[in-house]
Amino acid sequence: MARRGLLLILSSPSGAGKSTLSKRLTAWDPSIRFSVSATTRAPRPGEVDGRDYYFRTRDEFIAAVEAGEMLEHAEVFGNFYGSPKAPVEKALEQGHDTLFDIDWQGGQQIRNSSLGRDVVSIFVLPPSIGELDRRLRSRAQDSEEVIATRMARSKDEISHWAEYDYVLVNRDLDLAEEQLKMILSAERLRRDRQPDLMDFVRGLNGEFETR
C-alpha cells in the first residue's frame, strides 16, 4: 500500500553513536535516503556535486535561502551548509524516507518548516558523560583541545533532548539499532502516512454489501 515518506531527524552529542546508527539504518533499508546538503565550501578530492554535496557559490546559497529553498541552514567556520527543500519534497511524495544526521539547531528549523508535519525526530543520549568522553578518545583522531571543545558543546546539545519525539539511550549499539528500527516501522504505519487507506477501507465495506 502506498504511503507518504517521512523525514527522520537523528541528533546527538558527538560520540553518542548518531553516525553509526545512521549507517546501520540505511544498511538495513537501502531505500532510506541521506539528505544531501548544499555548501559553499570547496569540493574535496573525490567529492561529486549532487552525491556528496550540492556545491554552491556564496551568492547562490544566500539567494536560495532568501527564496525559501532551504529547509535549514547554518554558517560553520565561514562556510554555509543547508538542506535543499526540493529533493526532500520529491522524496516525500514518492514515498521515500529521508534521513537527516544534523544538530538540534538544524532539527529545530526543519520542525518549524512547511514540512514539519512529516518529521520524526530522535535524540541519542550516551549512557554517561564518562562513557561519552571514552568514546571520543577511542577514535584516536582528535587532539585534547578538540575533545575538550566537543565535550563542552555536548552539554548544550544534551539540554535540547526534550524537543525530540523519541529519545534513545545508547548503552548498547545493537539494542539502540533495534529500537531505532522499531520507531521507524511504527511511524511508517501511522494512518496519516497511508493515503490509500481510505479507499482500501471503502473496498472492504463494499465487500460487505456484496455478500
Swiss-Prot record:
Predominant location: cytoplasm
UniProt catalytic activity: GMP + ATP = GDP + ADP
PROSITE patterns recorded: GUANYLATE_KINASE_1 (PS00856), GUANYLATE_KINASE_2 (PS50052)
Annotated keywords: ATP-binding, Cytoplasm, Kinase, Nucleotide-binding, Transferase
A single MF term (Gene Ontology): guanylate kinase activity
Enzyme class, UniProt record, top EC level: transferase
Gene3D superfamilies tied to this protein: Guanylate Kinase phosphate binding domain, P-loop containing nucleotide triphosphate hydrolases
Subcellular location: Cytoplasm
SUPFAM superfamilies reported in the protein's UniProt record: P-loop containing nucleoside triphosphate hydrolases (SSF52540)
Xref: SMART domains: GuKc
Cellular-component GO terms for this entry: cytosol
Pfam families linked to this entry: Guanylate_kin (PF00625)
Domain Guanylate kinase-like: start-end pairs: 5-185
Documented EC number(s): 2.7.4.8
Residues where ATP binds: 12-19
Function, as annotated: Essential for recycling GMP and indirectly, cGMP.
Cited NCBIfam families: guanyl_kin (TIGR03263)
HAMAP family attached to this UniProt entry: Guanylate_kinase
Family: Belongs to the guanylate kinase family.
Protein name, per record: Guanylate kinase
Organism: Cereibacter sphaeroides (strain ATCC 17023 / DSM 158 / JCM 6121 / CCUG 31486 / LMG 2827 / NBRC 12203 / NCIMB 8253 / ATH 2.4.1.) (Rhodobacter sphaeroides)
